[in-house]
Amino acid sequence: MSAAGDLRRRARLSRLVSFSASHRLHSPSLSDEENLRVFGKCNNPNGHGHNYKVVVTVHGEIDPVTGMVMNLTDLKEYMEEAIMKPLDHKNLDLDVPYFADAVSTTENVAVYIWESLQKLLPVGALYKVKVFETDNNIVVYKGE
């Protein structure tokens, strides 16, 4: 009998990455005047940039053999593929096809990351994606 007995314990595991990207908040559904009113300086035609931070949290049972919910090396590789390769040092609006049809708000960046990770992670493992556009502007997305 293990130290935990027959009880299968669950845990959440989080990993943080940082990436730099530029974008412009602009909706083709709005006039130029409405875009300026809604998005303010973030509607600058030349765009602007951020040093984003992303915390990805997975959850599951702690494996009784490895003692892990997920191998951190695997999580790092999933995040490299879903976040760093497509987003780091990119213009989100021009370089990431997803944002051809979606305004590149932090909310939509979080959804994009969630959807990208869902394709790579084991089913049911992804718990939440937390995107820091700045230290003060943060979006949490749980696939809802």
From Swiss-Prot:
Keyword hit for Metal-binding: yes
Pathway membership, UniProt: Cofactor biosynthesis; tetrahydrobiopterin biosynthesis; tetrahydrobiopterin from 7,8-dihydroneopterin triphosphate: step 1/3
Positions of post-translational Phosphoserine modification: S18, S27
Active site location: C42 (proton acceptor), H89 (charge relay system), E133 (charge relay system)
GO cellular component, one term: mitochondrion
Cofactor notes: Binds 1 zinc ion per subunit.
Catalytic activity reported: 7,8-dihydroneopterin 3'-triphosphate = 6-pyruvoyl-5,6,7,8-tetrahydropterin + triphosphate + H(+)
Named cofactor requirement(s): Zn(2+)
Keywords: Lyase, Metal-binding, Phosphoprotein, Tetrahydrobiopterin biosynthesis, Zinc
Modified positions (Phosphotyrosine) in chain numbering: Y127
EC number of the protein: 4.2.3.12
PROSITE patterns: PTPS_1, PTPS_2
InterPro entries in UniProt: 6-PTP_synth/QueD, 6-PTP_synth/QueD_sf, PTPS_Cys_AS, PTPS_His_AS
UniProt GO BP: tetrahydrobiopterin biosynthetic process; tetrahydrobiopterin metabolic process
GO MF annotation: an example: 6-pyruvoyltetrahydropterin synthase activity
Function: Involved in the biosynthesis of tetrahydrobiopterin, an essential cofactor of aromatic amino acid hydroxylases. Catalyzes the transformation of 7,8-dihydroneopterin triphosphate into 6-pyruvoyl tetrahydropterin.
Subunit organization: Homodimer. Homohexamer formed of two homotrimers in a head to head fashion.
Designated name of the protein: 6-pyruvoyl tetrahydrobiopterin synthase
Gene: Pts
